[in-house]
Amino acid sequence: MVKPSLKIRKKVKKNVVEGVAHIHASFNNTIVTISDRQGNALSWATSGGVGFKGSRKSTPFAAQVAAEHAGRAALEYGVKNLEVRVKGPGPGRDSAVRALNATGFKITSITDVTPIPHNGCRPPKKRRI
């Protein structure tokens, strides 16, 4: 018996004008995700994913390159306006926002959504160098 041939559908790129940039800046890495208003991810990039390994991942320059990479991919969806949400205390917070601005997006708002515990878990011990 002959199997019916599968039709290959071309993926339709949706046109999104307003997006949300989620920047998660930890001490070890920076993750930049650009989504639509509903939270569906359009593009993302990390400092480690764009070629930085080890201690170079946690630099502001690595966060800048990751933000540019995610921004260029989001431009294909037609994103023009961005609302930026920054989470975490990492060194790549500001440079990622500046890189998104330089990519050509109009940034409408910058919000800090870092989770702050109401005396939750015990924090890690202080480093002795």
From Swiss-Prot:
UniProt keywords, alphabetically: Ribonucleoprotein, Ribosomal protein, RNA-binding, rRNA-binding
Signal peptide range in chain numbering: none
GO biological process, one term: translation
GO cellular component, one term: ribonucleoprotein complex
One Pfam match: Ribosomal_S11
Gene3D superfamilies per the UniProt record, alphabetical: Ribosomal protein S11
InterPro entries hit by this protein: Ribosomal_uS11 (IPR001971), Ribosomal_uS11_bac-type (IPR019981), Ribosomal_uS11_CS (IPR018102), Ribosomal_uS11_sf (IPR036967)
GO molecular function, one term: structural constituent of ribosome
PANTHER family: 40S RIBOSOMAL PROTEIN S14/30S RIBOSOMAL PROTEIN S11 (PTHR11759)
Function field: Located on the platform of the 30S subunit, it bridges several disparate RNA helices of the 16S rRNA. Forms part of the Shine-Dalgarno cleft in the 70S ribosome.
Homology family: Belongs to the universal ribosomal protein uS11 family.
HAMAP family: Ribosomal_uS11 (MF_01310)
Assembly mode: Part of the 30S ribosomal subunit. Interacts with proteins S7 and S18. Binds to IF-3.
UniProt-recorded name of the protein: Small ribosomal subunit protein uS11
